[in-house]
């Protein structure tokens, strides 16, 4: 009953029979592939059963952001972001945390690099996270995150990591 793939032998489907001499796989085009059992031990194959039982397929994609486009958010930018339904609560909550931190640590706000500030990259990451969490096609019971990876020569990768709701 497991779904296996062995491209080398043309198998991509459900195991329907296992005997001492053969393993029969019903491919998704309804053809039958017969494989000697020793190949399952001596060669590599992919068993998709864990993915089927997990409740969804894992999706892992990156979006590269041009490093030169990242900047601190101005009050005008934050006002625009607050108008976006998926961002309003995040911007309000984060701005409160930033202001409290800067006040508590007596930060001189006249210099932008002092203290904490929101960036357009951080706000975009929050937007992507909230967007994924709003989709019915994303499994909300399993991990769903957007994280920033190490910068590369092509930019700053934002990795989207989640599981689909359909197997």
Tell me the role of every PLM-derived stretch.
Residues 2-108:
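Soluble accessory domains appended to multi-pass membrane transport proteins
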Residues 73-83, 88-167:
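Membrane-proximal, solvent-exposed terminal domains/tails of membrane-associated proteins
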């Amino acid at each position: 009953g497991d779904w296996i793939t062995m491209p080398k032998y043309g198998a991509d489907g459900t195991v329907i029979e296992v005997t001492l001499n053969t393993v029969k796989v019903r491919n998704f085009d309804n053809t039958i592939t017969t494989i000697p059992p020793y190949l399952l031990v001596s060669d590599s194959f992919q068993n998709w059963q864990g993915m089927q039982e997990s409740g969804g397929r894992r999706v892992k994609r990156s979006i590269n952001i041009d490093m030169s486009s990242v900047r601190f958010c101005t009050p005008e930018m934050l006002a625009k972001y607050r108008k976006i339904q998926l961002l309003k609560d995040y911007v309000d909550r984060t701005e409160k945390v930033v202001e409290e931190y800067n006040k508590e640590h007596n930060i001189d706000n006249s210099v932008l690099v002092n203290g904490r500030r929101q960036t357009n990259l951080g706000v975009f990451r929050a937007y992507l996270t909230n967007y994924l969490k709003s989709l019915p096609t994303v499994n909300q019971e399993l991990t769903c995150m957007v994280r920033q990876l190490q910068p590369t020569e092509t930019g700053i990768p934002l990795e989207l990591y989640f599981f689909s709701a359909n197997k």
